[in-house]
Amino acid sequence: KLMPLDNALEKVNNFQKIMDIEKIDIKDAHNRVLAENIYSFHNSPPFNKSAMDGYAVLAEDTFGASNNNHKHLKLIDFIGAGDFSEKTIKSGEAIRIATGAPIPKGANAVLMEEYTSHEGNDLDIHSQVSPKDNISPLGEDLKKGDKILDSNTFIRSQELGLIASAGFKEIKVYKK
């Protein structure tokens, strides 16, 4: 016999077991169930970064550049992945940059290496870029405060990766 929805929900709620919660290190969280929503503590990436190998430039310095009309810039530094530069790019300058490296002050675009040639510190540009080209902006993957996982989520390896990348060391889970 069918019963009204309110009565059915009341019966189900009466049978619910309230589970205890514990806070554990994330290294012990595999195959557990989250007892809280997980929100990001920080932006990812935490800075504007280069989306490819190339040259951090002021886009305006490249306007009009083509295979038939090269523009010329002076190389002032190199930023490898995991490094950063204290230098600020001014008009007429460029910094060689690796994929994933933070965009230096003053730059507003990254010119792909394929559209350049250089000898020593002299850089010839064979193509133009627009502002923001080839830059992954701060928070592109994840913004501070974004919900990453819902409470009651079963924690597998991929969830652990998200939790760790969000900056968590400990989380609340339901006791076994």
Residue ranges of predicted features:
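Short, glycine/charged-enriched hinge/interface segments at domain edges or termini
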Residues: 56-176
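Short, low-complexity N-terminal leaders and the immediately following helix N-cap/first helix
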Residues: 1-69
